[in-house]
Amino acid sequence: MAINSKYQDKQVDEILKDIIEVLEKHKAPVDLSLVVLGNMVTNLLTSSVGANQRTVLAQAFSDALLNSVKTKHH
């Protein structure tokens, strides 16, 4: 999703592969996968980010997701 990241592509790709394998193991359709991933993002924000920064970070994440979808399909 991010164009510039402080994380190495290899690390991101390995974690992504693991998450995809779990979703495939459970035969999760797209809508269930999105619910699970959305809940994961919410959990990360509420458990690891201060209340004063949650909305800002959620908006930045949402914007990056929308830009990623627009970029990949146009």
Swiss-Prot record:
Pfam families: DUF1414
InterPro entries reported in the protein's UniProt record: UPF0352, YejL_sf
Gene3D superfamilies from the UniProt entry: YejL-like (1.10.3390.10)
UniProt xrefs under SUPFAM superfamilies: YejL-like (SSF158651)
HAMAP family assigned to the protein according to its UniProt record, in alphabetical order: UPF0352
Family, per entry: Belongs to the UPF0352 family.
Name by which UniProt lists this protein: UPF0352 protein MS1910
Species the sequence originates in: Mannheimia succiniciproducens (strain KCTC 0769BP / MBEL55E)
Biological classification of the source: Bacteria, Pseudomonadati, Pseudomonadota, Gammaproteobacteria, Pasteurellales
